[in-house]
Amino acid sequence: MTALLYRPDIDAARDRMTTWWNGGDIGRPGLLVTAPRQEPIEEIPILPEPPGWTTHYSVSDFDYRVNLSARACIHNHYLGEAMPQVAPDLGPNCLALYLGSKGVDGDGTVWFLPCIDDPEATQWTFDEDNFYWQFTLRLAREQLRLGRGKFLLSFPDLIEGLDTLAAMRDTQRLLIDLLERPEWVQTSLQRITALYFRYYDALYDRIADERGGSYYWAWAPGRLSKFQCDFSAMISPAMFDAFMMPVLREMTARVDYSIYHWDGPGAIPHHDSLLSLPEL
């Protein structure tokens, strides 16, 4: 790959990350370091902020999202293994949006409205025409065009498993479902995993770089994903093992590289289970 305008030595950084992911020694820890530039590396006109704009995740103004993407990396130096990248991200649980939830913009974030009222009537389908999915694809196309020779594309924050089901069902309702309809929960998790990879594969085919590498929080020389279960802080190790571990076993086996977002001290009881996953 020719040098990126925003990271001329990106090939050296990717070589180090390849060594790091494969257990090699790069002489130090991997470092994702950015530092502000005194002047932007290039001048890109700024569109005026739309009225009522509250979050960079918003889908209320496509052109403004494109402009934010174009300007996202121009004010930074990228050092260590950090790489300039943008994502067609709509919030921390894009999969829930693709599967039927609605997003409500908040101050610096987006909230997801539950969409499963009657569990037995749930339809788990891939909807090519879903508004949020189409917004993601349109934004990714523009980011790819703008980023050519300048920056990489990262995956949006898809999320999976119990966190996605909680966003769609409502957290308190799902906690009750674990006790009252565990078979429905298990079936739903299987369907969510299958649909996750419909979206993941479509995104990877679009955003992978010429090495086949992909980016989420860091770069990896293949199919990378971040997994998580913030919901796990509210359940016992036995429930985590019964409901979430099968999800994580399958998902970590279906990507080349994975990382886990471990959310706070409430999730510590699941330490041994997570360490038992050979692919994580």
State the predicted function of each range.
Residues M1-H56, V66-L68, A72-P88, G100, ...:
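Active-site loop segments of alpha/beta catalytic cores
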Residues D63:
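Ligand-binding grooves and catalytic loops that recognize ribose/phosphate and carbohydrate rings
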Residues Q85-T122:
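A contiguous, low-structure linker/loop signature
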